[in-house]
C-alpha cells in the first residue's frame, strides 16, 4: 500500500470516530448530570 491517497479513508475514519465519540461523551455527561441533579 502506498502512502499516497490514504488520506480520504483516514479523514472519513477520523471524522466518524470523532463524530461518534464527542456526542457519546456529551450524552453520558448529560445523563450523569441529570441523575446527580435528581438526587
UniProtKB/Swiss-Prot annotation:
Positions bound to heme: 18
Subunit structure: Heterodimer of an alpha subunit and a beta subunit. PSII is composed of 1 copy each of membrane proteins PsbA, PsbB, PsbC, PsbD, PsbE, PsbF, PsbH, PsbI, PsbJ, PsbK, PsbL, PsbM, PsbT, PsbX, PsbY, PsbZ, Psb30/Ycf12, at least 3 peripheral proteins of the oxygen-evolving complex and a large number of cofactors. It forms dimeric complexes.
Main location group: plastid
Gene expressing this chain: psbF
Pfam families: Cytochrom_B559
Record note on cofactor: With its partner (PsbE) binds heme. PSII binds additional chlorophylls, carotenoids and specific lipids.
Cofactor(s) needed: heme b
Family named by the database record: Belongs to the PsbE/PsbF family.
Alphabetized UniProt keyword annotations: Electron transport, Heme, Iron, Membrane, Metal-binding, Photosynthesis, Photosystem II, Plastid, Transmembrane, Transmembrane helix, Transport
Keyword Transferase part of the UniProt annotation: no
UniProt name for this protein: Cytochrome b559 subunit beta
Places the protein is found: Plastid membrane
A single cellular component GO annotation: photosystem II reaction center
Domain of life: Eukaryota
Protein's membrane topology: Single-pass membrane protein
Physiological role: This b-type cytochrome is tightly associated with the reaction center of photosystem II (PSII). PSII is a light-driven water:plastoquinone oxidoreductase that uses light energy to abstract electrons from H(2)O, generating O(2) and a proton gradient subsequently used for ATP formation. It consists of a core antenna complex that captures photons, and an electron transfer chain that converts photonic excitation into a charge separation.
GO BP annotations listed: photosynthetic electron transport chain
Membrane-spanning segments: 14-30
Gene Ontology MF annotations: electron transfer activity; heme binding; iron ion binding
Amino acid at each position: 500500500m502506498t502512502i499516497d491517497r490514504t488520506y480520504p479513508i483516514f479523514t472519513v475514519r477520523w471524522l466518524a470516530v470523532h463524530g461518534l465519540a464527542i456526542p457519546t461523551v456529551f450524552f453520558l455527561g448529560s445523563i450523569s448530570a441529570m441523575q446527580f441533579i435528581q438526587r
